[in-house]
Every structure is written in C-alpha cells, then in structure tokens.
Design a protein with these regions (language model features):
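Beta-sandwich interaction modules
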Residues: 67-81
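Short, low-complexity N-terminal tether/leader segments at secretion or assembly junctions of large
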Residues: 1-12, 91
Length: 100
C-alpha cells in the first residue's frame, strides 16, 4: 500500500502558440520547442484541404498520419514539437499549434 501526496505542481512559464504552413511533402512542425503539458494541433479552419499529422515515419511513407479536416484538432503529448510532422493533402495548408 502506497500513501502518496502531491503538495505542489509547477506550471510551465511559457505558452506555445505557432501557425505554420505545410505543403504536400511532410515536414517537422517546429524545431527544438520543449513541451511540458502537451499541444493542440489544429487544421486551420480556412484551409481548403485536409492535413495529415504524424511522426517522422511520414517522411518515408506518405500514407501514414492522422487526417484532420479544416477546423479539426487533436491533442498530443510529446516532449518536443520536433516529434510532430505534418503535410497537406493538396496544395498548401496552415496548421495551428497551441500548448505548454
């Protein structure tokens, strides 16, 4: 039997707020941005194409990834934004990132 008590949690001191453009070739969404509590990834509502979100395996396999329609979002818990890749199904699209 364990008796655990949390006395304090430290909240991150910065907010991550980024909009990045992606084309039809997968790319890392941002480099060297530490994440503490996770991030929301949103396909910008004004996009005319769906986007795909995934890991580095999207570089070698174009069919991998989670599809987001314009306005859709997903919450991901990663330690750094350099673990998240994105691409547009067609043309260029914007991806919004919000987290801490």
């Amino acid at each position: 039997l364990f008796n655990t008590q949390v006395k304090q949690t430290k909240q991150p001191s910065t907010l991550i707020s980024i909009v990045t453009s992606v084309g039809s070739k997968a790319k890392v969404l941002s480099t060297n941005v530490d994440v503490h509590n996770g991030v929301y990834i949103q396909s910008h509502p004004s996009n005319s194409s769906n986007v795909m979100i995934g890991g580095a395996s999207m570089l070698s396999n174009t069919s991998l990834g989670h599809v987001l329609e314009p306005g859709d979002s997903v919450f991901l818990q990663v330690s750094n934004l350099n673990a998240i890749y994105g691409k547009s199904i067609s043309g260029n699209s914007n991806i919004s990132i919000l987290g801490s």
